[in-house]
Amino acid sequence: MKSAFLIAAPTSGSGKTTLARGLMALFTQQGHRVQPFKCGPDYIDTKFHEAVCHRPSINLDTFMASEEHVRELFRRYTQGGDDAPAWAREPADVAVVERMMGLFDGYDRYHGSCADIARVLDLPIILVVDASSAAYSMAAILHGFIDFFPDLRFSGVIYNKVGSPRHAAMLREVAAEVGIACLGCIPKQAALIQGSRYLGLDFSEHTQDE
């Protein structure tokens, strides 16, 4: 497998599902075999993952399953082999793992959280942050997430809902000062705003099966 990473955010509503879906679609269009995963028992976002990756999204849950089982699931659906389903026999090129809620939100403090999955699988984290109402205050937010659990690895930050080129420049300076790579700045766009229903986003108008 060429690449595997986890997409997380400080809170729900930061844009991680929309970003994850976009990256999955991009990698798939480029000809990569993309294996999607969802942290926790979420049954809505996995449907959206499958729509763009053309293969089932697998749930990873350290509350419902042991750490050993989570590692085995990840291995089976990324590395392939005879013990994998027919559609997963060939190794994946890219694995994208997404989580609902915030990075450290679990059933008991951080246990069962996205951070727990990142720790168990030793995956680098891309942090998606809603930057619509902050500039230099982002330094404190980024420091807090990076320093809170030193065992985690952060590949970088993607700022969402950025207001202007000047705002983006300020946010890039913040990332450089904190010591984390700025992987991108997504401008605030009405077209990217998704409604929500039940436990997840509502993409019904964009899917063919609804």
Question: What would you call each of these model-derived segments?
Answer:
Residues K2-S14, T18, M24-L121, V129-L152, ...:
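ATP-dependent carboxylate-amine ligase catalytic core
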Residues Y136-E210:
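Internal gly/pro-rich beta-alpha loop/helix module
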Residues I125-V128, L183-C185:
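Short hydrophobic alpha-helical runs that function as membrane-insertion/retention elements
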